[in-house]
Amino acid sequence: MSKVGFHISAGGRRGLGDCLKQCAEAGNPLPVIFSVDQDIWPDLARYSPQTVYIFRTQKNLRNQELGDGPGSMYSGDPAKTARDWMKEMMPMWAKNRAHYYAPLNEQDPAQIEGFTWLNAFMSECLNIAEANGYKLALYAFSGGNPKDVLQPASGRPFTRDDSWRELIPSLQRAKANGHILLLHEYGFDFETLKNSMPYLALRYRHAYRLLAQYNADPPLVISEASAGVGFAGISPRAWLDDVKWYDSEIMKDRAVIGCCLYQLGGAENFVKLLPNLADYISQTPTPPPASGDAPVVPGPDLDAQGQPVADDFVFIATADTTPAH
């Protein structure tokens, strides 16, 4: 079935229930929904109980803004920071039922030591979550990250593979104990996801070929996905065509649960396209994963020398130019 799901934030989502119902009754339920401080569980329980649901909060019980991560990221003791952060998160999680909970959003270290810190932080988050009966959705790196930082402002150069290697212990634990990984993929200045492949779209395949060697490849959700920076500034037809192309690719990969189109709600609201998306998702058959027993299919992400494509350029590429290596 289709692997297209939705990212949902505050704003109009009229028609969501009808969409969920149509897809579920057709035997092709939405694979996944990610929400930010929106209670979607009742809709899923009523219309689409098979849908995987991920929740993230930006507030604590005192209605104070928490943001995307703790203020002591990378500087404080990672275990203590995790304990303090989870103490703020979990009371909100207890009020919002979900299958998985995301403790971080788009924390992208500028130095390799930051990934070492993140691994220790997330390992303690996993300790606390498991002791309290929660499953986590880890990391949620932004589009194009982790990336090669070959000329850092300070510290030593490192590649995306170096970054992933620092995270292997927490990802091994995640896979072993039923947690998942989140990543974001956008077209950015390439405009469409299709044009951005493999520099932005489908870059997870490179990571998963590496992580699988260490049994550190948990199930994956692309929790934000869209042409551009979300459904805005691009024609509906072009955006939908890009969604269908992206879906045709991620359906090939066994590791991918699904993607969450950005977004239902907010300034990028695609609510007017819900009927179109419902028709597409409900009518899309289920192909066998082309990756077979492997987590992902092979992908063209190597340069002429057989090295990973450097991606210092990923945020500055023009819309109609394929970057030089």
Which residues fall in each region the model found?
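Boundary/entry segment of secreted carbohydrate-active catalytic domains
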Residues: 1-38, 261, 317
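Aromatic-rich peripheral "rim/lid" segments of glycoside hydrolase catalytic domains that contact
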Residues: 5, 20-24, 49-54, 232-324
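Short, acidic/polar
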Residues: 11-25, 78-93, 159-167, 243-247
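Distinct, well-ordered alpha-helical segments
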Residues: 16-20, 44-45, 145-174, 200-210
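Acidic (Asp/Glu)-rich catalytic clusters
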Residues: 19-27, 40-55, 89-97, 130, ...
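Substrate-binding cleft of extracellular glycoside hydrolase catalytic domains
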Residues: 40-162, 189, 235
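Aromatic- and acid-rich polysaccharide-binding/catalytic face
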Residues: 51, 55-65, 105, 140, ...
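Aromatic-lined carbohydrate-recognition surfaces of secreted/lumenal glycan-active proteins
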Residues: 130-160, 214-230, 255-266
